[in-house]
């Protein structure tokens, strides 16, 4: 069963190109270790909420943009094995491919796909 890792982050708007380059480099590593696809989306219409919202969830500050991303894997097992390899891959190290955003406010989780229409 297809498995999805989902991510939401706040990225300094001025770092859009740095983020795109970071994500492209990361995508190569993830795909080499079993990911089927990696998608990165730059916030365009992401409203503030009163109780909950993407900006609130990642404590988005002025001058930051919400990014929504996901990685598709063939299965949970493939994801677990692949993620271990990604984390051990030297190309994933912060000194090689630094994150151009505050990783402490990154939200992520793994999800079983139940509808793919």
Mark where each language-model region is.
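Short amphipathic alpha-helices in soluble, non-transmembrane regions
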Residues: 20-26, 82-90
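N-terminal pre-domain and mature-chain start segments
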Residues: 25, 29-33
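Conserved long hydrophobic alpha-helices within structured protein cores
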Residues: 33-42, 73-75, 81-82
């Amino acid at each position: 069963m297809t498995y999805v890792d989902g991510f939401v982050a706040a990225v300094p708007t001025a770092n859009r190109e740095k983020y795109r380059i970071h994500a492209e480099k990361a995508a190569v590593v993830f795909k080499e270790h079993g990911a089927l696809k990696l998608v990165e989306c730059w916030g365009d219409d992401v409203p503030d909420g009163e109780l909950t919202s993407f900006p609130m969830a990642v404590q988005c500050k002025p001058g930051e943009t919400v990014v929504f991303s996901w990685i598709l894997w063939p299965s949970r097992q493939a994801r677990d094995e692949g993620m271990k390899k990604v984390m051990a891959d030297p190309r994933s190290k912060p000194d090689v491919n630094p994150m151009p955003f505050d990783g402490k406010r990154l939200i992520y989780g793994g999800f079983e796909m139940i509808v793919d229409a």
